[in-house]
């Protein structure tokens, strides 16, 4: 089971239980540098993700990343430096989701432009090619639909828990 999480509840007792179960992988939400990440996810979130990565790596638990890219963080979260940091922490795969302005704090100005979406398609294809020496396999939730038979949401293979605790078929 792949569980997408902000990682704030991952601690040692939790990791021990996950190891005992043996069938859970995690996708950790991260959106760039400490300041960029915490501005969107809340103070201390970046440090919580870094700590969770250390624990998951220590316990040998499979994990990747869930990265929301915006018009403001797109180049930072696809930079060689960022990708290498993720690999050093133990993540070698992840999903990129482009920002969708939904909810009470929607910010349409954070939506990637068409040119930025094209950059993502090209950058992800490059990172997956043999030209790249970064051992990280990125997937683009929206732009890789052809490889997974279309959107995986909508009652097929995905649902999320919203901030009110309700299960929904899509974001």
Where are the model-predicted features located?
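Gly/Ser/Thr-rich beta-alpha loop segments that engage phosphate groups in nucleotides
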Residues: 34, 105, 157
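C-terminal scaffold of the Radical SAM
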Residues: 65, 89-93, 105-132, 160-163
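Flexible glycine/acidic-rich beta-alpha junction loops that bind and position SAM and/or redox cofactors
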Residues: 72-74, 93-114, 137-150
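Accessory C-terminal segments flanking Radical SAM cores
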Residues: 135-171
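Solvent-exposed, flexible loop/coil residues
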Residues: 14, 103, 155
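Radical SAM/AdoMet-radical enzyme domain recognition
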Residues: 1-98
């Amino acid at each position: 089971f792949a569980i997408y999480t902000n990682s704030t509840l991952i601690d040692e007792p939790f990791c021990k239980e996950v190891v005992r179960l043996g069938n859970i992988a995690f996708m950790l939400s991260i959106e760039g540098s400490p300041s960029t990440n915490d501005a969107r996810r809340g103070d201390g979130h970046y440090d919580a993700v870094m700590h969770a990565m250390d624990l998951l790596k220590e316990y040998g638990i499979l994990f990747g990343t869930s990265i929301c890219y915006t018009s403001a963080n797109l180049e930072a979260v696809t930079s060689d430096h960022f990708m290498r940091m993720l690999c050093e922490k133990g993540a070698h795969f992840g999903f990129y989701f482009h920002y969708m302005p939904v909810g009470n704090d929607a910010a349409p100005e954070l939506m990637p432009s068409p040119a930025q979406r094209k950059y993502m398609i090209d950058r992800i294809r490059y990172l997956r090619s043999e030209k790249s020496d970064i051992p990280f396999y990125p997937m683009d939730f929206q732009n890789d639909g052809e490889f997974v038979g279309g959107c995986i949401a909508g009652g097929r293979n995905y649902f999320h828990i919203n901030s009110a605790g309700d299960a929904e078929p899509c974001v």
